[in-house]
Amino acid sequence: MSYPRAAITLSLVMAACSSETASTGTGPEPYDGPPIPWDYAPFPAVVEPADNPTTADKIALGTLLFYDPILSRDQKTACATCHSEVWGMSDGLAVSIGVDGEGPTGPGREGPNLTTRNAPTIWNVAFKDELFWDGRSASLEAQALEPLKTETELDLDPESAVNALAAVPEYVDLFDAAFPGEGITTENIARALSAMERSVLSVRAPYDRYTEGDVGAISETAKEGMQLFADGGCDGCHTPPLFESARYVARLPVGQDVGREEVTTDASDHGAFRVPTLRNVRESGPYFHDGSAPDLETAVRTEADVSAARGEGRALTDEEVARVVVFLNKALTDRTKEPPRPHSVPSGLQIPEDGFRVPR
């Protein structure tokens, strides 16, 4: 099986090691850019464990694993089924459909194995030290194996995954290159996938260029939406520059999903979920942990109404909602470092295909 390994590797090295990425997290500098309605902060440092330093070989391997259905019981489902670049590194569904699903990735997919939550985007997970809506994983390496073992997702035990990969000579070579002297292990599967996920960065959105002095990077309408976003206190949870935070908040009516409480057993966490990033949010709907908001307008209006009901803000008019949405759509969209979809994978299996394309 042939695939553009060199092209993939080159693209990923640029994504992981460019000066743009390396310049983040180096400490605060005096802000002298155009007006912004909050205190300026630089990007934080990438969270990278000492035992898994990022390399181009790991990222290249992780990308192939991410798109290869070899890591699923049905040999048709991949990580990219629920985290596709077409759908903002999510899947366009309210809740995901894992193994035994039929149809394209995204709307139109059907199947018996529904997850209980909306697929969170993997944009900028490199900056997180807790993963999933409930924060149950303390590292990307721990997170990477959970879908593998979950019956409604990939449903493949780690030992079977190792054996399947070991039967493909190209994967043997790729693991030897990425992990010399170690080979194919469960831990190295997780490390390769984590390295790939750390390369999926949004750090060059129009908002970023605006703060660097390009006043024309965002429109006047987007600037008005940015001010409304700040006036409503939205930045208190969706804090720039990542437009997210490590907070867990209960904003929606609590159903059967108790959220963070299941992890901490603390009643104060009842119905609380981690604040998601708003970068590339244009493409990652439906929204909220349960996918109950079909579009951004609904999500923004719902959040504003909740804030108003709690005395933390006010409801927004339709025109104001539209301006906030323009800010989110136009100022925070940045796909320059999304993973390159390979043309084929070493297993020879069919990469999950998207039957629908969202507007670019």
What residue spans do the PLM features occupy?
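Bacterial N-terminal signal peptides that target proteins for export
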Residues: M1-A7
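Periplasmic c-type cytochrome electron-transfer domains
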Residues: R5, S18-R360
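C-terminal motif of bacterial Sec signal peptides marking the signal peptidase cleavage site
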Residues: M14-A16
